[in-house]
Regions:
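Intrinsically disordered, low-complexity regions enriched for glutamine and histidine
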Residues: 6, 68-69, 150, 223
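N-terminal amphipathic/basic-hydrophobic helices that include classical n-h-c signal peptides
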Residues: 1-19
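Helicase-associated low-complexity/disordered flanking segments
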Residues: 16-113, 117
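Conserved P-loop/Walker A NTP-binding site and adjacent catalytic elements of P-loop NTPases
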Residues: 114, 121-236
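Coiled-coil-like amphipathic alpha-helices with heptad-repeat character
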Residues: 3, 25-28, 171
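Hydrophobic transmembrane signal anchors and adjacent membrane-proximal interface regions, especially
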Residues: 7-10, 43-46, 156
Length: 236
């Protein structure tokens, strides 16, 4: 009773609150993703013929979002094998000598600068100037023929055999080792030739199984002015 005016209830107290926490469970550490970026960078040191296949395997592994130690180990082994093959080929590159009396020898620095700076180079010169025999040697000196062969086409079989023999002789190598040739019914190439002479028809036929001709890092189309059907297809 307060002042006779009625009952007044005491202010209700707030209910007690309790904080309930569950025991903390440590979040399992997510396994680290394999370092694919460094493996993609290693492709530059592989054979051209291996790069596309290995890049596709790495891309599939990256896009899957999963860790596959077995596949990663297989890719690493393939990268190592391809890089070792490149190193072995580089160690076999000879130091070429050039006959001083040939016009191509006199202009070799100019030609090499053009080869270094441009994807496609047209070399014109008189018959006997040394284009056919010296261009592959110029390419070898630039470091070509290592990640793939230097392909060198001739319009006729006899020319392919003769030129291969001459270049091999100038490099001081038995025919079929550093320099080989392939014509119809006859293949004289060792396991790891740096330069391969062939008819233009042979090279064109290889596009069936190697559409981008990744077996080669350089291709020389000799006698291109003859403009045969095979040569036109190759240039295209």
């Amino acid at each position: 009773l307060r002042d006779g005016r009625g009952l007044q209830s005491a202010p209700a107290s707030a209910p007690p609150t309790y904080a309930v926490t569950a025991p903390s469970t440590p979040t399992p550490a997510r396994p680290s993703r394999p370092d694919l970026r460094s493996r993609f960078a290693r492709l530059d040191g592989c054979m051209l013929a291996d790069r596309g296949r290995l890049a596709a395997r790495l891309a599939r592994l990256r896009d899957s979002g999963r860790d596959d130690p077995q596949e990663l180990a297989a890719i690493d082994a393939a990268l190592d094998a391809s890089a070792a093959r490149v190193a072995a080929r580089r160690a076999r590159v000879p130091v070429p000598a050039y006959p001083e009396d040939l016009p191509v020898s006199e202009k070799r620095r100019t030609i090499q600068d053009a080869l270094r700076d441009h994807q496609v180079v047209i070399v014109c010169g008189e018959t006997g100037s040394g284009k056919t025999t010296q261009l592959p040697k110029l390419c070898l000196e630039l470091g070509r023929g290592v990640t793939g062969m230097i392909g060198h086409t001739q319009p006729r079989r006899i020319a392919a055999r003769t030129v291969a023999g001459r270049i091999a002789q100038e490099l001081g190598s038995p025919l079929g080792e550093l320099v080989g040739y392939k014509v119809r019914f006859n293949d004289v190439t060792g396991d790891e030739p740096l330069v391969k002479l062939m008819t233009d028809g042979i090279l064109l036929a290889e596009t069936v199984n190697d559409r981008q001709l990744r077996a080669y890092d350089t291709i020389i189309v000799d006698e291109a002015h003859e403009r045969s059907l095979n040569i036109d297809f190759l240039l295209g």
